[in-house]
Amino acid sequence: MKKIIETQRAPGAIGPYVQGVDLGSMVFTSGQIPVCPQTGEIPADVQDQARLSLENVKAIVVAAGLSVGDIIKMTVFITDLNDFATINEVYKQFFDEHQATYPTRSCVQVARLPKDVKLEIEAIAVRSA
């Protein structure tokens, strides 16, 4: 059975979609841009944007009763491949801090993202039986 995930710890949807969907064994997040859920502010720096997007993904996964370690796949959309190394540093630090194995990942450059942010991240997490 499908359950919609909603949390105040991640920014609300800016279109006709939900933050996440829990299918029981799997959780899918919508793409998370670096919007602070409390203030609506967007950091200017790509490092801060990457960290905030990861924290927003984490908030949705946690709202579903899972943890960072349950994430098995991430897709990262970036507007400038020159930011790839910087984003990788933040990404590595985030997963290391949570003592989680790195999930599979795709990273693609796109022309533009909502609110002209530098990146967007979505995830798939799996609930162990």
Curated annotation (Swiss-Prot):
GO MF annotation: an example: identical protein binding
Pathway membership, UniProt: Amino-acid degradation; L-threonine degradation via propanoate pathway
Keyword terms: Hydrolase, Pyridoxal phosphate
Modified residue annotations for N6-(pyridoxal phosphate)lysine: K58
Top-level class of the enzyme under EC nomenclature: hydrolase
EC number(s) from the headed UniProt entry: 3.5.4.-
One Pfam family it belongs to: Ribonuc_L-PSP
SUPFAM superfamilies: YjgF-like
One of the protein's GO biological processes: L-threonine catabolic process to propionate
Function text: May be a post-translational regulator that controls the metabolic fate of L-threonine or the potentially toxic intermediate 2-ketobutyrate.
NCBIfam families reported for this sequence: PRK11401.1 (NF008490), Rid family detoxifying hydrolase (TIGR00004)
Family: Belongs to the RutC family.
Subunit relationships: Homotrimer.
Protein name (record): Putative reactive intermediate deaminase TdcF
Highest classification ranks of the organism: Bacteria, Pseudomonadati, Pseudomonadota, Gammaproteobacteria, Enterobacterales
